[in-house]
């Protein structure tokens, strides 16, 4: 009988790989359906004008055990390229390094990581699920210390949307607030899913693209898609929240499944003429309080840069602009940071918007209880909810892989 996996992102591919390699499942008994026209989901290495760059998932952490294991398994260790932790901060029209940022906010902490360590280790009697991270830290830190946290993390979703309990957990596990060492993979992160995809193709696993799940009939163990109906013995769902909110089968479970919010993300890559834009030569990763949010250097010598990485309402700001309007605004916001430098419009840009870039446990929701409730509701029907969406490490590949490992234990 067929095990159907819905979603050919890293979660679905990893599950199929594990079922075949470690659970001795016959590859002919696995069917993967994917609503888009490509595999890989939110891992996407884009190719443009001779350049390759990641426009979806951007980085991995050495503390992420499952990711590290996968890299070793596919002999990709030599592709690891460490990211420097050195950053600048553009705050109130001032470009500051870490020491200057701490001094600007009159901090009693000697480093940002020491402030984060204090926050993560702080013991509180409050119910952290009932407030967002910003409100939680405001109960025991000064206004200025809270501003340092806000400015040094930079994300809207993690600070204002995610509940504080899950924010602390993921900050501790996955962010570079406590010297977590991050890296990218040379040639792009897509190599991870491509290796799994190659394995599945060699095993002749059937993968159907442009195949959208429309409904589920758990009595007859059948799924309805835009192509045809398929019978399953077990159904694995690696889909985003929109699927759970629109598929009729889940209508009676909306309150349970609506416990996460959807975080949108947007990356803008730009290629500059380095002779006319001297500012690009020594630019570091820069967190800004203007609409650029994050500036992430890619190749300073050639002039390729991720000129803006944004989330939430800031991502929406850029997404509605035309290419010309984006170029004009890039000049405007860069001139704020480099008022004495010549800043031209980029030669070209590419914009990459993810309406479901990540998911975040809502304020007032107890993630651990909800995870158990989801399992209790669907597991008896041989339906399994997996992926980053309801994981303990949302917005990270590691969260997706953890849900697969937990399922197969």
Which sequence ranges carry the predicted segments?
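Glycine-rich FAD pyrophosphate-binding loop
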Residues: 20-47
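Conserved Rossmann-like nucleotide-cofactor binding loop
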Residues: 11, 38, 242
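Conserved flavin/dinucleotide-binding core of flavoenzymes
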Residues: 14, 282, 289-409
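Active-site/ligand-binding neighborhood in enzyme catalytic cores
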Residues: 120-212, 221, 238, 243-248
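Beta1/beta-strand and adjacent pyrophosphate-binding region of the FAD-binding site
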Residues: 1-11
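Central helical "cap/lid" subdomain
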Residues: 218-223, 228-280
